[in-house]
Amino acid sequence: MSIIISHQSAIELLRTDYVYQIIANTSKGTFRHPPLIPNRPPHLSEKRELWKTLHEILGSKPQLPIHVSITSNNGVYQTKGLQIHILNEKIPKTAFFEILPNLYLTKPEYIPIQMSRSCSILELALLASKLMGTYYIDQEGELKSRESPLITRKKLERFLRKHSDVPGCAKVWSALALSCEKAASPMEVKLFIRATLPCSKGGYGLGEMRLNQEYKVKKLTSQTKAFAIRKPDLVFETPKASRDKQPWKAITLEYNGQYHTTVEQQIADGIRHNELVSAGIKNYQVDKEIYYDFNCMQNLVVCIRKDIGLPERKLSHEEQIRYRKRQQDLVKLLDSIDPARWGSNVKQENHR
């Protein structure tokens, strides 16, 4: 019998190199799809074999319960170690692909729709950004990088348009409006959301931006004329009306996490920063302490707004107090989202 792994368990498997290589090495249209969607959950012997298989793929025990999807709820009961989901009849077999004989997985573009019932819009935005990013968190909790994302925004949007009548699509569209592509870490995603959300939602309203855009710069450590490619975390979009007045080629913002605390990395970061500045790129940097310092972040945003030609925001004392509360609430909300258990800590928020 075929088994379809879905929801949280599918997300867990998508971060493995085994599944990533299947996606990366499979040409468009050549995925193997289930011949039939199963209409019953796995029996006890099948469940034991499934647990063993997932353990081998993950390299550790799978999170319980294991989420599986079927087509019918006739006589279906929840059983220990499994979470049974009933598939919407409008979802085609092509939303799943084979990872082993008779074992199928939800495709990345369908994951946000599956998770839409249990996730808030903001949580879905982080999930979509993760699927469209070049990072993943391994089983030991370590941040790792990949050459390319599991899915592009274009592909996800195409799936949503094609299946617009499936419940959850509208919610995912709302989340997609808050999400980003090409993020290299979870903190880049959070910084992006804080920077781009409107001020009424606790963000800084800094407009559109790109992540990890490549810039060719002169290597300052080279004795010969050599160049290097640098990719700042966030690149701000300068309004057309301000571009002629802009002395800088670009305004960028970077997050320096724990990896950047060693002496060797700080030296490399200093050289990299100077290379960007020498190439005409104004490069702001924040670390964990600055990220959580609301006064420092607000003052930094004032500078960035001026650099990219956005008007200064003038607030009364009472408005400033209310705005600061919204900023704090947003940061708390972002921190409350558990990337290992999507939908486990749903908060009510209005970021539509």
Features from the language model and the residues they span:
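Short gly/ser-rich loop at a beta-strand->alpha-helix junction or flexible surface loop bordering the NTP-binding
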Residues: 1-167, 325-352
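Surface segments flanking catalytic/ligand-binding clefts of nucleic-acid enzymes
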Residues: 147-352
